[in-house]
A protein has these predicted regions:
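N-terminal Rossmann-like NAD(P)+-binding subdomain of aldehyde/semialdehyde dehydrogenases
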Residues: 1-101
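Residues at or immediately preceding the N-termini of alpha-helices
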Residues: 6, 25, 43, 227, ...
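Structural signal for hydrophobic packing residues in well-ordered secondary-structure cores
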Residues: 17, 21, 36-39, 43, ...
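Conserved C-terminal structural/oligomerization subdomain of aldehyde/semialdehyde dehydrogenase
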Residues: 23-24, 220, 271, 318-459
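Residue-level signal for inorganic ion chemistry
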Residues: 28, 73, 134, 165, ...
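ALDH superfamily catalytic-core signature
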Residues: 193-327, 390, 450-452, 458
Length: 459
């Protein structure tokens, strides 16, 4: 698509925005219900597209994509009217006879750039929040998940007018061309490298951004943890979608006294959840493409594999794999793994672990398995991270009642539920001053008595 054509789409959306149509909350509710209907009506097509792109099972497609999207819509439909209401706030004495209030307003024309790993969820979740806030949206799904991207384009264009919502497919050239346009807000989910470029391009128009990136999310297991339960939940969170989850536990960081017992439990759980031959499990997915398959395989040091390690280049599959004797200097610890490889590293003291985690880039997530309240308080207070779980993994992502987002190198801003509505809204602070009285204190000429009165109401 040419730059001029993109600009025409944006101009049409901006013109539609200025009609004020989407300021009506009833219009937004109708749009959310239409999106809800679209997803339910075409659930089987969505499932088939996810199977093609990522070999996702029917169960996983609903649990991790379609179901979560429908849950977000359901939540937003219940709360949108209260979110969109003007909110009265207190007025200082110096401004008496006034009404002070905060008014949520849509930004206008927004761009949502989504990734390939959860191509339905991570495209439609921010779209729901943007619609609820009253924006127009251009969606740019990933070229790496073509079946899902093409399906989204077909469905969105069938159910919504392009002046309101539209999908632009394509690869790097389309991304580059889009980022050169003037948007009122940009929401990006993806790699840190591209995130920096998004922010750089947005700065030329002073466009605000939300960046949902990634990082090496640690999974701490202390000496008090229930190892059987920890292993079960770590294996679930790590190997879901073949480890291609932005909040997957990147590595296990456990108390050195519990390592051997934990490894035994991890091995047992991998076999229990995926079978003795995971690559033959019909519900086990695949790596998205050859490029990422080779990247992950380069991180797989055979000398450090203690479980798994099998690969199938023909199907782009890598079995759930445990690695031991890994150091923080190893290649696998220099980048986000984003695949089914799980290093197990030990610490001697919890303070040592906290210091090490804080010496690294801020992770998108952190997980702690512990029964000790003091350890839970210490880790959640002292470690820098976007969000996380205590005694579980990744489930903090799956709730509309809390915002989800990163910090530092793992991103900025948040979304889901009310946080998502606020992300796509500019809140105007307004004072409505009454006209029946106008005290002269603030006006020149200034006199000592005016300053005396001023000191009574200020400070």
């Amino acid at each position: 698509m040419e730059n001029t054509e993109m600009k025409k789409i944006i101009d049409r959306q901006r013109a539609f925005f200025h009609t004020g149509t989407t300021l009506d909350v009833s219009f937004r509710i109708a749009a959310l219900k239409r999106l809800q209907y679209m997803i339910r009506r075409h659930e089987k097509e969505i499932e088939a597209a996810l199977l093609l792109d990522l070999k996702k099972s029917s169960f996983e497609s609903y649990m991790c994509e379609t179901g979560l999207v429908l849950d977000e819509i359901h939540y937003m439909l219940r709360h949108i009217r209260s979110f969109a209401k003007e909110q009265d706030v207190r007025t200082p004495l110096a401004q008496f006879c006034s009404r002070s209030y905060r008014k949520p307003s849509p930004y206008g024309v927004t761009l949502i750039v989504s990734p390939w790993n959860y191509p339905i969820l991570l495209t439609l979740d921010p779209l729901i929040d943007a619609i609820a806030a009253g924006n127009k949206v251009i969606l740019k799904p990933s070229a790496y998940s073509p079946a899902c991207s093409d399906l989204l384009a077909k469905l969105i264009h069938r159910y919504f007018p392009a002046k309101y919502l539209t999908v632009i497919t394509g690869g790097r050239s389309e991304n580059t061309a889009l980022l050169q346009q003037h948007f009122d807000y940009i929401f990006f989910t993806g790699s840190k490298t591209v995130g920096r470029e998004v922010m750089r391009q947005a700065s030329s128009h002073l466009t605000p951004v939300t960046l949902e990136l990634g990082g090496k999310s640690p999974c701490l297991v202390d000496e008090s943890a229930d190892l059987a339960l920890a292993a079960r939940r770590i294996v679930f969170g790590k190997f879901l979608n073949c480890g291609q989850t932005c909040v997957a536990p990147d590595y296990v960081y456990c108390d050195e006294k519990r390592k051997e017992a934990l490894i035994c439990e991890l091995k047992r759980q991998i076999t229990k959840q995926f079978g003795s031959e995971p690559l033959k499990n019909p519900s086990y997915g695949k790596i998205i493409n050859q490029k990422h398959f080779e990247r992950i395989r380069r991180l797989l040091n055979p000398e450090k594999v203690i479980f798994g390690g099998n690969v199938n280049p023909d199907t782009l599959q890598i079995a759930p794999t445990l690695l031991d004797h890994v150091t923080f200097e190893d290649a696998i610890m220099q980048e986000e793994i984003f695949g089914p490889l799980l290093p197990v590293i030990t610490y001697r003291t919890l303070d040592e672990a906290i210091t090490r985690i804080n010496s690294m880039e801020c992770p998108l997530a952190l997980y702690l398995f512990s029964k000790k309240k003091e350890n839970i308080e210490k880790v959640t207070a002292k470690c820098q991270f976007g969000g996380g779980c205590v005694n579980d993994t990744i489930i903090h992502l799956a709730t509309p009642y809390m915002g989800f987002g990163g910090c530092g190198e793992s991103g900025m801003g948040s979304y889901h539920g009310k946080d998502g509505f606020e992300t796509f809204s500019h809140t105007k602070s307004i004072v409505d001053k009454k006209t029946w009285i106008d005290l002269p204190v603030r006006y020149q000429p200034y006199r000592p008595v005016k300053k005396w009165l001023l000191k009574k109401v200020l400070g």
